[in-house]
UniProtKB/Swiss-Prot annotation:
Keywords: FAD, Flavoprotein, NAD, Oxidoreductase. FAD binds at residues 4-33. It comes from the Bacteria. Pfam families: GMC_oxred_C (PF05199), GMC_oxred_N (PF00732). Pathway: Amine and polyamine biosynthesis; betaine biosynthesis via choline pathway; betaine aldehyde from choline (cytochrome c reductase route): step 1/1. One of its GO terms (biological process) is glycine betaine biosynthetic process from choline. It comes from Rhizobium johnstonii (strain DSM 114642 / LMG 32736 / 3841) (Rhizobium leguminosarum bv. viciae). The active site is at H465 (proton acceptor). Its EC number is 1.1.99.1, 1.2.1.8. Its cofactor is FAD. This is Oxygen-dependent choline dehydrogenase. InterPro entries: BetA, FAD/NAD-bd_sf, GMC_OxRdtase, GMC_OxRdtase_N, GMC_OxRtase_C.
Length: 549
């Protein structure tokens, strides 16, 4: 088997790459995917979002090493093992990120990836339904919508934000990237609109695109050039030959793992694993970043939450309605209100993110209390804590070693304490007067710094936004893995394009910027002139120096 371009991974970036590299029919593309089909309601029905993440069929099922600052808990670290990758098992929340995120990328050496550079690619990929005119794309492959916003608890949340003195925004993916407002979703026609549905399946209708199901073992490197990929398929080892380039889009865990298995990474670590060093790049696997969050939960005194739909019978009713009409509760992820807030005056951008949910549930999807309730997922999104990905052994089937070092920076504790107290202030506004019952979690007895810290150690979880482990930077940066054209430094014919190349975590969910990365990388790979830089300037809060807390 051979193709001009061989892409490892059919996730958010990999699917976009397959679509763009194969346009026009000139170039042949093979996509290697370790997982399988996304057929069925567990993935396609938006309200079933908790299911695929808990199923080994769709999820690599990784765990972190014991986290010292979180009571030595091993934190779940899911990644999609299915066409569409993590876009097929995620929460379907669409966030581009803040303009400052991408300007920071350029400051860190990713020349040509500032906000003005990436905004045209966000527009190219989007088919926005109801976004801000002039700031959003309207004919791209990725459908982005807003929910019905019919539950009164959503409206109470946004109104409470206004009462607390915060901004509101009509479109946080438009010019005003701060405040309370409606959440955007990658849902279309009542279905999850994953990267597979948006990009990969249309690409596979072309004669020049093929998907091969198998586990990538290593990249074949000959005389300093990547020439193919060794895969295991149906119990046999095969080589997929790349006539032009190999592109790794296997996730922030598996992209560095695959590079290291191929001899690209920290030299001493590779030698310890018995792997011949092809390129000593100490940045491979370093710089692991993520978002953390916790659930803040409140009893609702009125029966307006989704609690009534949690019993199996009513879940079945919702599922049947969705199967028949692609409508009803099954057609929404139920994340329809959100907020992006600054935790202190003087900050250039928001650093706290809220997802509001009109039900109080635990991480396994079960009711947190035997009553109606509501909750927010809240987290500090600009942590300075950094971790790493390394090899457990030279066996391609062995899980990578994930050390996040969560909460290893003193500022993290300060910011998360602030999240607890700020959420109490928001839920304490008069907008929630008709709904606010007792606090379920953290609990009204959790007040002091020490009590809050104890709660956080036991209840903080990953928001599932890992990135940064094959960092993009200047060619002379010893910790950079790829240059701003996404080429692996030191090896010809090899690129990485996914969230692993992010120099710094973006503020918000990562599916959107990961797809953008695939879109932009495709132009670099094809030698095209990048899309013209945007001259649009995002809104700046005129009260930024004195407002918020």
């Amino acid at each position: 088997m051979q193709a001009d371009f061989v892409i490892i991974g059919s996730g958010s970036a990999g699917s976009a790459l397959a679509y763009r590299l194969s346009e026009g029919g000139k170039n042949s593309v093979i996509v290697i995917e370790a997982g399988g089909s996304d057929f069925g309601p567990f993935i396609q029905m938006p309200a079933a979002l908790a299911w695929p993440m808990s199923m080994k069929r769709y999820n690599w099922g990784y765990l972190s090493e014991p986290e010292a600052n979180l009571n030595n808990r091993r934190i779940t670290a899911p990644r999609g093992k299915v066409i569409g990758g993590s876009s097929s098992i995620n929460g379907m929340v669409y966030v581009r990120g803040h303009a400052e995120d991408f300007n920071r990328w350029e400051e860190l050496g990713a020349s040509g990836w500032a906000y003005a550079d990436v905004l045209p690619y966000f527009k190219r990929m989007e088919h926005s339904h109801g976004g801000e005119e002039g700031w959003r794309g309207t004919d791209g492959p990725l459908h982005v919508q807003r929910g019905g916003f019919t539950n009164p608890l959503f409206q109470a949340f946004v109104e409470a934000g206004k009462q607390a003195g915060f901004e509101t925004t009509e479109d946080y993916n438009g010019s005003k990237q701060e405040g309370f407002g409606l959440m955007e979703q990658t849902i279309f026609g009542g279905r999850r609109w994953s990267a597979a549905n948006a990009y990969l399946k249309p690409a596979l209708k072309r004669d020049n695109v093929k998907i091969v199901y198998g586990l990538a073992q290593r990249i074949v490197i000959e005389d300093g050039r990547a020439t193919g990929v060794e895969i295991e398929r149906n119990g046999r080892i095969e080589v997929v030959k790349a006539n032009r380039e190999v592109i790794v889009s296997a996730s922030s865990f598996n992209s560095p793992k695959l590079l290291m298995l191929s001899g690209i990474g920290p030299g001493q670590h590779l030698q310890d694993m018995g792997i011949a060093v092809k390129a000593d790049r100490p940045g491979v696997g370093a710089n692991l970043q993520d978002h953390m969050e916790f659930y803040f939960q409140q009893v609702s005194t009125k029966p307006v939450s989704l609690y009534s739909w949690l019993p199996w019978f009513w879940q079945g009713v919702a599922g049947a309605q969705w199967l028949l009409s692609r409508g009803g509760l099954g057609a929404s992820n139920q994340f329809e209100a959100c907020a992006f807030l600054r935790s202190a005056p003087g900050l250039k951008q928001p650093d706290i993110q809220y997802h509001f949910l009109p039900v109080a549930i635990s991480y396994d999807g079960k009711a947190a209390a035997k009553s109606h309730g509501f909750q927010v997922h809240v987290g500090y999104n600009l942590s300075k804590s950094r971790g790493s990905v390394s090899l457990r052994s030279a066996d391609p089937k062995a899980d990578p070693v994930l050390r996040f070092n969560y909460m290893s920076h003193a500022e993290d504790w300060e910011k998360f304490r602030h999240c607890v107290r700020l959420t109490r202030e928001i839920f304490g506004q008069s907008a929630f007067h008709d709904y606010r019952g007792p606090e379920i979690q953290p609990g009204e007895g959790v007040q002091s710094d020490e009590e809050i810290d104890a709660f956080l150690r036991e209840h903080l979880e990953s928001a599932y936004h890992p990135c940064g482990t094959c960092r993009m930077g200047a060619k002379d940066d010893p910790m950079a893995v790829v240059d701003p054209q996404t080429r692996v430094i030191g090896i010809d014919g090899l690129r990485v394009a996914d969230s692993s190349i992010f120099p710094h975590v973006t503020y918000g969910n990562l599916n959107g910027p990961s797809i953008m990365t695939g879109e932009k990388a495709a132009d670099h790979i094809l030698g095209k002139q990048p899309l013209a830089r945007s001259n649009q300037e995002p809104w700046i809060n005129p009260r930024a120096a004195v407002s918020d807390r």
